[in-house]
């Protein structure tokens, strides 16, 4: 494997692509596990819903800060190093988040995971688009489908470990190991084009997907409409994942373990939608699919 896959509508599923998919899915594992654990963490810390919601605020704020820094970090360090540092920061954040040291520690851990996670997602997405060429949109949808599958499993795992008295932290501790193992596997890929893993080659045409060149012209109006739609979808998704378990405990009388596991209904729907979306992305234009 010495060059990018031949451009086409169907993604080229080689080893580095699968590793990248898996790394994105591991972040999704935490993301949806984060929502499932919020009510459990609030019970443990004895805080109100208002105080517990600080975790969501910190997560969002850290996302914004990291998102502003990522382009410069990719320019300076390259994609490979950004992914490596992101995995390290995320693993450290999970360890701090799950440490029984009270609210300050869980907030700090949340910020670290958010910074590492958004850095991992942005950099891995840029790599996939660059590496897969015209199959990039379909590849991203495939990656999101696999991530949704992990998101479907994590509430069930957290609910099961809570019911078995193993504690909700067990699944997140296993996630740390999985993150480090996948990064070790990625770093040991001898035939991966280093320029594409580190910093994409500067193309002659700035319109190439995932390129490292910069076009400082204003974004078209269609971009801002698309960004607005994605923002609304993300707001809906985070509202469901963060508060569904707590709402089911209050309104439906579910126990902590059952409420955490029930979040799988939300993430399972996302998984089915992304499976269908990955097929449609191979046949329809991206703007039509978004509509």
Which role fits each region the language model picked out?
Residues 32, 59-68, 152, 267-271, ...:
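Residue-level signature of mid-helix packing/kink "hotspots" within the transmembrane helices
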Residues 46, 78, 99-104, 133, ...:
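Helix-breaking motifs and short loop linkers at transmembrane-helix boundaries and internal kinks
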Residues 10-37, 111, 220-236:
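Pair of pore-lining "gating" transmembrane helices in MFS-fold secondary transporters
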Residues 65-104:
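Conserved MFS/SLC helix-loop-helix module at the cytosolic interface between two early adjacent transmembrane helices
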Residues 134-135, 142-191:
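Helix-loop-helix hairpin linking two adjacent transmembrane segments in secondary transporters
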Residues 105-119:
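Hydrophobic core of transmembrane alpha-helices in multi-pass small-molecule transporters
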Residues 119-132:
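Intracellular juxtamembrane helix-capping segments at the cytosolic ends
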Residues 34-35, 221-264, 271:
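Extracytoplasmic gate region of multi-pass secondary transporters
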């Amino acid at each position: 494997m010495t060059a990018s896959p031949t451009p086409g509508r169907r993604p080229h599923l080689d080893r580095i692509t699968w590793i990248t998919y898996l790394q994105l899915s591991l972040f999704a594992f935490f993301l949806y596990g984060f929502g499932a654990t919020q009510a459990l963490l609030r019970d443990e810390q004895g805080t109100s819903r208002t105080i517990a919601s600080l975790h969501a605020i910190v997560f969002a704020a850290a996302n914004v800060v990291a998102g502003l820094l990522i382009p410069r970090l990719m320019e300076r360090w390259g994609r490979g190093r950004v992914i490596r540092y992101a995995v390290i920061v995320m693993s450290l954040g999970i360890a701090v988040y799950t440490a029984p040291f009270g609210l300050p520690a869980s907030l700090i851990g949340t910020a670290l995971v958010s910074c590492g996670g958004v850095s991992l997602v942005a950099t891995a997405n840029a790599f996939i688009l660059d590496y897969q060429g015209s199959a990039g949109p379909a590849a991203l949808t495939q990656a999101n489908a696999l991530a949704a599958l992990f998101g479907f499993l994590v509430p069930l795992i957290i609910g099961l470990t809570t019911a078995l008295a193993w504690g909700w932290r067990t699944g997140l501790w296993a996630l740390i190991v999985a993150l480090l193992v996948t990064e070790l596997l990625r770093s040991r890929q001898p035939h991966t084009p280093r320029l594409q893993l580190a910093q994409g080659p500067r193309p002659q045409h700035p319109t190439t997907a995932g390129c490292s060149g910069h076009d400082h012209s204003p974004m078209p109006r269609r971009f801002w409409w698309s960004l607005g739609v994605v923002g609304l979808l993300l707001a809906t998704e985070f509202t469901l994942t963060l508060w569904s378990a707590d709402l089911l405990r209050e309104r439906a009388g579910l126990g902590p373990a059952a409420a955490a596991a029930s979040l799988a209904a939300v993430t399972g729907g996302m998984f089915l939608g992304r499976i269908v979306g990955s097929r449609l992305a191979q046949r329809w234009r991206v703007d039509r699919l978004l509509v």
